[in-house]
Amino acid sequence: MSPSSSSSSWRALVLVAAAVLSFSGHVVVAAAAAGHPDYADALAKSILFFQGQRSGRLPPDQAVKWRSNSGLSDGSAANVDLTGGYYDGGDNVKFGFPMAFTTTMLSWGVVEYGGRMRGRVLRDARDAVRWAADYLLRAATATPGVLYVGVGDPDADHRCWERPEDMDTPRAVYSVSASSPGSDVAAETAAALAAASLALRAADPGYSRRLLAAARDVMAFAVRHQGKYSDHVGGDVGAYYASYSGYQDELLWGSAWLLWATRNASYLDYLASLGANDGVDMFSWDNKLAGARVLLSRRALVNGDRRLDAFRRLAEDFICRILPGSPSSTTQYTPGGMMYKSGHANLQYVTSASFLLTTFAKYMAVSNHTFSCQSLPVTAKTLRALARKQVDYILGANPQGMSYMVGYGARFPQRIHHRGASMPSVAAYPAHIGCQEGFSGYFNAGGANPNVHTGAVVGGPDQHDAFPDERGDYDRSEPTTYTNAALVGCLAYFAGSYRS
């Protein structure tokens, strides 16, 4: 399949010149462009992506037609219903820890920027939140005193290349409890349920109350029974998404969300007892400190609650660590201008940081707040400019001239690391495709994927802005739910600011 031109192209894009630029000792080919991307189109596609990640029985209005029902017996190994939810990336495992973070970030985007989402886009965003929230609610309430945190055998799954509709690898079930605690995954699940309750409160007040009640219970469990889930969960679920930062950040994050959702001062007292910890320069499914501090800054700046100024100052410290030109910056940028944090799925850090920049800028603007990174003055405009540059890079303003969102723009990745996208749909090829047949017939094939996974944001280019577009390169070619989840809010903000 060759890349197809679509309405997602930058409508105002005019290639003015290609120039060889010297930047920090590197040589880069850059394209100058007038106008801006079609943020509204990118927003709609970034949300549509989640339909391609769905597990369970798909609804009649499913728009991604190359997907079908899958994982319909999930949970049966523990005699519970754990159907639904999302596959985290290009495999067929449901990891509760990153799924909960995905839900929290999607919900935060709806809460902050739902007013900038038009019509069906807002409905689709809420549907994406609810698909995950339904699963997390089942995982949190199916068995008293137990939180289910994963379905599927990661090692067995990764030894196969199968469509989710065909998968015949073990669907093991993993959980945490009082005797096998997991404060990290429990507090993140509480954050997700609380955030979703806010995102869905106007649309379905009764459901919102159910989510919040479950969030309270799961947060109490996280505080009462402390420990890292990767130390207690069997199999390799914890190994794939171990909380390397520990669980104090999730306890802070969960408390911050419950403070907002409930307005109960006991959560304020608890998060104050956790203290203000070390500075950080990234925000991810693992380390939530920066996100918690920005979230608490909302109350400090918008509501004038001076008790949270320490968290606001730490949020500013995070920003100073990622701003180009800041004397305290610890962040590398590629020659083409992309924030670079890791060789593995770097764009997850770009989208999460961009969301925090956009959101903190919103709080600054409302309160007429400014601050300084030593000698560098920082305004809301400063933060928005950096966030927009990162989003534009993802959408094609980069040395490759490639959009890293599948289906957006005239040129985008063709061979993403994704089982379902890389194999013919069940509708097109109903016969079962086995574990090893998938590798020989599809994974190792050199052509484009037969299914365009519209809206999927891949791991992204390397530190030199290079992107090989190879299916086997999961570091750069695999999309993840948490990469997209953080981008949704940014795109909603820019779609509302720059109407095409």
UniProtKB/Swiss-Prot annotation:
Gene Ontology cellular component annotations, sorted alphabetically: extracellular region
Species the sequence originates in = Oryza sativa subsp. japonica
Tissue specificity annotation: Expressed in roots and flowers.
Q: What is its EC number?
A: 3.2.1.4
Species lineage, top-down?
Eukaryota, Viridiplantae, Streptophyta, Embryophyta, Tracheophyta
Protein's cellular compartments: Secreted
Pfam families in the cross-refs: Glyco_hydro_9
Indicate the residues that form the catalytic site. Answer: D91, H417, D469, E478
Q: Name one GO biological process term.
A: cell wall organization
Any idea what this protein is called? Endoglucanase 11
UniProt-annotated glycosylation sites, renumbered to this chain: N264, N368
